[in-house]
Curated annotation (Swiss-Prot):
Keyword Heme (UniProt): no
Full protein name: 3'-5' exonuclease
Any one GO biological process: nucleobase-containing compound metabolic process
Function: Has exonuclease activity on both single-stranded and duplex templates bearing overhangs, but not blunt ended duplex DNA, and cleaves in a 3'-5' direction. Essential for the formation of DNA replication focal centers. Has an important role in maintaining genome stability.
Binding of Mg(2+) 2, residues: 165
């Protein structure tokens, strides 16, 4: 802070020819009034006032915005220092946001974390496939049996991915209701929606479909869905399903070297470059009421359809990554591979040149 020397008034004696006016008060206050009322003292006070008004400090304060209108009430000198700093070669640095363990490495390299990027305007998902909707026990059993037969015919595949999701009503007064809808997708051209409202017990064929040895169930936060399904329908055992399922968010972090928890909507943005219409009106609707309307059916179908699309994309990325890693090790050795891997290389793209 700059310091300014301000000339203080000096005490002078009254001229003998002048007669001061009669003053009232105690002797102490009268002496003070005498000092203030002298002509010399008044003139010096005026000079001091003018001198103070002309100081650079107050001139800058007059130019700056009033304190009440400034977001940060800086002193005039600080305002001047900030202006000089902005005019210099090095502009003031903004305080960095708090870094989490998952985003620290990317932030240090100056690369934004993909899952933290502001979503761009993406086209909405348009599902044009079939939606097979069933509400009766025997209909659900027959449909599940048809899916099992289709899976058994896929003799060239050791694993058949099947997108899985659930819906249930929710009330702020009573909390989540009983599991009301199960939707699955094994082929992007057809989604199955099973409404469970009339069922006291799940059909054996549906339970067999979920536990099929070739089926790989996948979804987002899918383990919590299985636990809820077991609570609502005890004939379902959650542990075997959890052991063989794939959480798409966790898998994405492993393949793409990202971090944090994912929602299905954000995964669709990041992987499929599509936007999802997550209408609260539909999401919080009465899923237990039969029949479901067109908006509910489309909402349920899109959830598993885009899940299947994301799985296929991640599966392809994993193949490319493993192939690139194998080629790099063969050409450069394990030591170079570990060094490049430590630098954050994902190997999702082919590396043609290495500089360490």
């Amino acid at each position: 802070m700059d310091k300014y020397l301000i000339k203080m008034p000096t005490k002078t004696n009254l001229n003998g020819d002048q007669k001061p006016a009669a003053l009232k008060g105690t002797p102490k206050t009268i002496d003070k009034q005498k000092e203030k009322n002298t002509p010399t003292e008044k003139q010096k006070q005026e000079d001091d006032y003018v001198e103070k008004e002309n100081t650079p400090k107050l001139r800058n304060a007059q130019i700056a915005k009033p304190a009440s209108k400034r977001k940060n009430q800086d002193t005039p000198t600080e305002v001047k220092d900030i202006k000089n700093e902005e005019d210099g070669e090095n502009p003031p640095k903004r305080r960095s946001a708090r870094l989490t363990r998952s985003t620290r490495s990317m932030a240090e390299e100056g690369t934004p974390s993909p899952e933290k990027e502001k979503p761009e305007k993406l086209p909405f998902i348009k599902y044009k496939g079939a939606i097979k909707y069933y509400t009766e026990n025997h209909e659900i059993a027959a449909s599940a049996d048809d899916v099992i037969q289709w899976i058994d015919k896929q003799t060239t595949l050791d694993v058949v991915p099947m997108a899985f999701d659930m819906e249930w009503p929710f009330s702020f007064q009573t909390g989540p209701g009983k599991s009301s809808v199960i939707q699955v997708c094994v082929d992007e051209r057809c989604c199955y929606v099973y409404q469970l409202s009339k069922l006291k017990k799940l059909p054996a064929a549906l339970v067999a479909l979920l536990n099929h040895p070739k089926v790989r169930l996948h979804g987002v936060n899918i383990k919590a869905d299985f636990r809820k399904l077991q609570r609502d329908f005890p004939e379902v055992s959650a542990d075997p399903l959890i052991e063989k399922c794939v959480d798409l968010g966790v898998w994405c972090n492993e393949i793409c070297e990202t971090g944090g928890r994912w929602s299905l909507e954000r995964l669709a943005n990041f992987i499929a470059k599509k936007a999802m219409d997550k209408s609260k009106k539909v999401r919080m609707s009465k899923w237990h009421v039969i029949p479901l309307d067109e908006n509910q059916l489309m909402y349920a179908a899109i959830d598993v359809y885009i899940g299947q699309v994301i799985y296929r994309d991640l599966e392809q990325r994993e193949k490319v990554k493993l192939q690139n890693e194998a080629n790099f090790k063969e050409q450069n050795g394990d030591a170079a591979f570990k060094a490049v891997k430590a630098l954050g290389e994902t190997f999702l793209d082919k590396i043609t040149q290495v500089t360490i």
